[in-house]
Amino acid sequence: MAAAHSSPGFPLIAKGGALSAGARAILAMGNLHDGAEEGEEYTQPPAEVTGNDVLSTAWRVSTLLEQGKASLADLQIVIRHLRDDAFLRRATRLHRYPGGTSSSVTEDRLKGVVRQVLDTAFGRTNDSEGADVPSRTATEALACFRNELERTRYAAVFTAHPTFAVANEVYAALASYASAPEPQDVAPDMLSHRRKAPPTLEEEFTLASAAILRGRDALDRLNVELLGAASETWPEAWSSIVPRPIIMTSWVGYDTDGRTDIGWWDTLRLRLKMKLFQLQRLRQQIVDSGAEAATLLSRLSRACYTVEAQIAACPKSADLEATVEFATLIVDHKEAAILDPAVLGDALQDVIDTASPEAALSVAVARAGFFAHGMSASHSHTRLNATQLHNVIRQRLRFTDDPADPAHRRALLAHINEALESVSAVPVDFGALLVEQASAARLMMTVAQIVKHIDSTTLVRFLIAETESGYTLLAALWLARHFGIDDKIEISPLFETREALMGGAHIIEEALRSPHWREYLRKTGRLCLQFGYSDSGRYVGQLAATYLIERLRLKILDLLHVWDMEDVEVVLFDTHGESVGRGGHPFRLSDRFAYLSPMHVRAKFAERGVKYREESAFQGGDGYLLFGTPELATASVVTIAEHTFEPATRHDDPVYDEPDFSSDFFSTIADAMTGLVADPGYADVLGAFGPSLIDKTGSRPAARQSEGGGVSPRITHPSQLRAIPNNAILQQLGWCANTIQGLGSAARRHPETFETFREGSARFRRALDFAAHALAHSDDQVLRSVIWLLDPGYWLDRATAEPRSGKRERYLSVMHDLERLDFWADTQSMFRRIQEDHLALRSIWPEAPTIHPAEKLLHAIRIALIEKIWVLATQIPFFMPRGNFTREVMMQRILCLEIPSVLRELDAIFPRGGSKLDYNFHEPAGPQVDNSYSQEHDEIFQPMREMFQMMREISVALMHGIGAFG
């Protein structure tokens, strides 16, 4: 059901028969309907809610429901209308984000990329008359062209981060609407946009691989243009060029950081599927080209059949007999399955040399994609955390000191260097893999089996989360050497905490002091680094995080000079999400790349002659949207190519010209966000009922679970939440603190300079785009209304103003239960901290965006639903404790909105009962006394269930408005 009228800026639901009077009245509260019906008036709310328009609106909604002038069905209609309007606006933004999806515009942009590459190859410059003057001969230009294209410069990394926030058909509809030539004004008719269940790992893999294959198709379009231009420019030499400037990469199924539900058999099965996709793709491309290639096609078919058999035999658990059968197929038939793309190199070149020009180009494009990605549809990243590595080293080498203790750091570094001197490789087989208990060793052994039996040439990234010491990198190197694959993996630290971002250069230097690490870097030719924008954003603030990451990159560049390692390529992998709180620029994909990888840093690397590769993440369902259709995928790849081939030249920018101000400004933000994170009230407001506002959005096990029917553990620090739910909760509370906290304090310190930078610095303006978007979805009155809900005093005031004794007692009951939770004092002081900073920002930046009326109305409706659920819960009849489930526990969990689990308990305590038995039991019928609790179900439990579902649908509507989950 869609809004009758929609505009990018302001939805207006037209008056008419499609809406009930109750729905129209609710929409009118947010000025989203063209007026209430004649005679519809609003009673003024009581004094305790005046001064807060969100609570006032919530009170009016509740009053309409109580008076029978609106029903829950009316609320559901309103929520769907507002959700659908947000969906349409999100689709329009998605259309614009990669620069539009028009095929003609995309084609022109592709040709523009090719012109840029050719201009660079020939060294063309404009003469005094404006004509292009090449500075290189055709032969020299060919060498330069080849150099530009045959080195990978960018990787799109597809991850399974839990942002699968809506049903798959909703994502498909979003991508389809965004790919339409014109904005649509009628949303798809769906009762709910929510998922029926969290995605499984297999489902995540299916969605990721579909996005990757669309990305591969888009890369082929780019290569058609590049190789087509090469064939016209160098007709005798073009066919030997194998471009690979941009690649696709995945860690879906290979990421074991913080999860134990992915077995080595899962990783190998999914990796074999990616190999099969690659082989099938190449075979189909050669068939479609029309070239004569019978022998090559036969070889590819045999490889496909072999890999299919390997996949079918892959165990589903640590099953000994199944593993033996699998080993037979994967070890004994690895040559038939093809281990190295080079095996097909001569055959592919022969086909290109003998085919017609059109077929030759098609096969050359197919070969480029095949050689760029190896024996997989994408490159592979594995991931684990530093603790897992430390544990296996402690087990293998008996190092008992704690790597986190600085007092033991030097001794540990000395010990691991000694161990690297003497380490020798041990064999790896599936028997050893079956019995291995250490997760880090198991992952390294799994990688060893991949490079031995699936793909022998493509390096595998080995990402290490929570890296806090150079010791961790050397420990990973020891483990790789121990299993004989140190030349096959790219060890990469992840920097995302404030400590890691501030001390990251020291971590790298600790590793560089080891001759073994330097030897390893020279052997692989790359220093791989990963930068996390989610955790860094939530701990130091998103705007400060990017500044710290930028500084860290330049410090590492200096270290390479100090250690004479400037001939090593640096891989800069930015792990970010689609939301502003997680590093995704809100308005343009091109600005996202410029924000993550500022031209100033790129130019510094170029000036030093240090090669670098950029990588950035497309995370979960939200991230895959940019590859959700062929049109979106091609527009995204073109944007990547434009960024990748843009010459790295430094531009004047006050951010770099006045480093003292920049340092002070971003440090102030970081200090303010750090202070907020440490505030007990911040953890309280995140943990009170925030986790219950969002659905489970990934296959990764939840960090926060209720046990034994008791009260869920209280969140005492944001670190007890994962980063994505943390950020998603902030969005749902109407305050994107991770993006705007501290900005007011920083601006207040230098108001004139702040204004100057806003007007004169592209780098600064790009950062403020994040704040602008966050402010457009934040409102201090929304946050204050949440905090007031948690205040027993608010409920006492409601009780005092309530003339009906029954209702008064219910308010007092809620008050007493909230007193037991004891959120009030800390959340109030935390709010004062936030509001003071916000007032400072508004005084310096008065024209900053404000929240959309539709979003504010959604927040108000949800406040009304929460109040109604809490008050309704006070009517639940007395019951005897059921295990740990007592009435006190029940109310605490209801106040935390853990409604589904509470209702499961109540369904068991108060069974609805069955229908009357109408059978012949061969004697006079006795009275069938109805001892069921159907009235409680109809009047309490079912309304609570319906209202909770509506709250979750509101969360989806708000998420559509923001444009991303978490």
Short names for language-model regions:
Residues M1-L412, R538, E566-V571, H576-F587, ...:
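Often metal-dependent polyanion-binding catalytic scaffolds in large enzymes
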